[in-house]
């Protein structure tokens, strides 16, 4: 089964996330487990944790279909030792928060070298950060999101994702989330069914489909290779519907969270219905 959803709000309490997902007809969802604009947040209350788990169960959401995202403040490749330490501590906290909720995944952007080190040195720092976080948690999988390649962000090439996985000690607890807008912006063509098929075959060759743990289904405002991370509603950008039809019809994308991060949250329910209609 295809598991579609969106990145929903936790306003009023994290236990509201599954309710918000259910309201749009989702069968998966993404969320932040804290205020993503702050380095530190108070611990989750036991009552909120219990209510979150109960609402997930009541809504039919399995934990493997929920894709929490870490704070955008975190840079696991930061060349500054003090800032790197702060990012690592925050990432470990994110892993432990996810674990306390019973979640199985944590989605994150790999990191940036800020023109202060080589890309290879930055990849090593990111991999070391992943290994540290896995040592400080017991069951959550670190899910690396591909990037558009803006600025000095790494993770825009499949080879970089493969390198991070190779340097991760416990490969059973590392995976990838493919964002379609980021793929397109990074130069991987998705504008036709043939092009999209070749892009996913290349991912399989370089990284391996066995590591795919989720996707962000976003169209792109800018042309292929722009390196600009600007999302559009599905079918209303430069990608078009062919790639999304392929995802919805291919068995390779079964039973992983397929998450909308498109700009019109009021239209998510309709986008979900439209995507299911592509099957």
From Swiss-Prot:
Keywords: DNA damage, DNA repair, Endonuclease, Hydrolase, Metal-binding, Nuclease, Zinc
Name of one Pfam family that matches: AP_endonuc_2
Residues annotated as binding Zn(2+) 3: 182, 229, 231
Residues holding Zn(2+) 2: 145, 179, 216, 261
Residues the record lists as binding Zn(2+) 1: 69, 109, 145
BP-aspect Gene Ontology terms: base-excision repair
Cofactor(s) required, per the database record: Zn(2+)
Cofactor remark from the record: Binds 3 Zn(2+) ions.
Reaction(s) catalysed (UniProt annotation): Endonucleolytic cleavage to 5'-phosphooligonucleotide end-products
E.C. no: 3.1.21.2
InterPro entries cross-referenced by the UniProt entry: AP_endonuc_2, AP_endonuc_F2_Zn_BS, Xyl_isomerase-like_sf, Xyl_isomerase-like_TIM-brl
UniProt GO MF annotations: deoxyribonuclease IV (phage-T4-induced) activity; DNA binding; DNA-(apurinic or apyrimidinic site) endonuclease activity; phosphoric diester hydrolase activity; zinc ion binding
Function: Endonuclease IV plays a role in DNA repair. It cleaves phosphodiester bonds at apurinic or apyrimidinic (AP) sites, generating a 3'-hydroxyl group and a 5'-terminal sugar phosphate.
Family statement: Belongs to the AP endonuclease 2 family.
HAMAP family cross-referenced by the UniProt entry: Nfo (MF_00152)
Name recorded for this polypeptide: Probable endonuclease 4
Species of the source: Chlorobium luteolum (strain DSM 273 / BCRC 81028 / 2530)
Gene: nfo
């Amino acid at each position: 089964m295809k598991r579609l959803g969106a990145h929903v709000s936790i306003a009023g309490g994290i236990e509201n996330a599954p309710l918000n997902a259910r309201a749009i007809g989702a069968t998966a969802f993404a969320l932040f487990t804290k205020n993503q604009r702050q380095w530190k947040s108070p611990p989750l209350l036991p009552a909120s944790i219990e209510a979150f788990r109960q609402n997930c169960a009541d809504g039919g959401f399995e934990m493997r279909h929920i894709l929490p995202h870490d704070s955008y403040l975190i840079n696991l490749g930061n060349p500054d030792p003090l800032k790197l330490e702060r990012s690592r501590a925050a990432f470990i906290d994110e892993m432990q928060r996810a674990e306390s909720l019973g979640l199985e995944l944590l989605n994150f952007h790999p990191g940036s070298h800020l023109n202060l080190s080589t890309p290879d040195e930055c990849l090593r720092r990111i991999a070391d950060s992943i290994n540290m976080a896995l040592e400080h948690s017991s069951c959550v999988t670190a899910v690396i999101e591909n990037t558009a390649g803006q600025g000095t962000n790494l993770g825009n090439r499949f080879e970089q994702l493969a390198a991070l996985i190779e340097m991760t000690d416990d490969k059973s607890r590392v995976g990838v989330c493919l964002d379609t807008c980021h793929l397109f912006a990074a130069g991987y063509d998705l504008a036709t069914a043939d092009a999209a098929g070749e892009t996913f075959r290349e991912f399989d060759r370089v990284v391996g489909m066995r590591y795919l743990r989720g996707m962000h289904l976003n169209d792109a405002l800018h042309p292929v290779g722009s390196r600009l991370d600007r999302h559009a509603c599905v079918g209303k950008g430069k990608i078009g519907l062919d790639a999304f039809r392929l995802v919805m019809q291919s068995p390779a994308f079964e039973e992983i969270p397929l998450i909308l991060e498109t700009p019109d949250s009021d239209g998510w329910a309709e986008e979900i219905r439209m995507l299911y209609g592509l099957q």
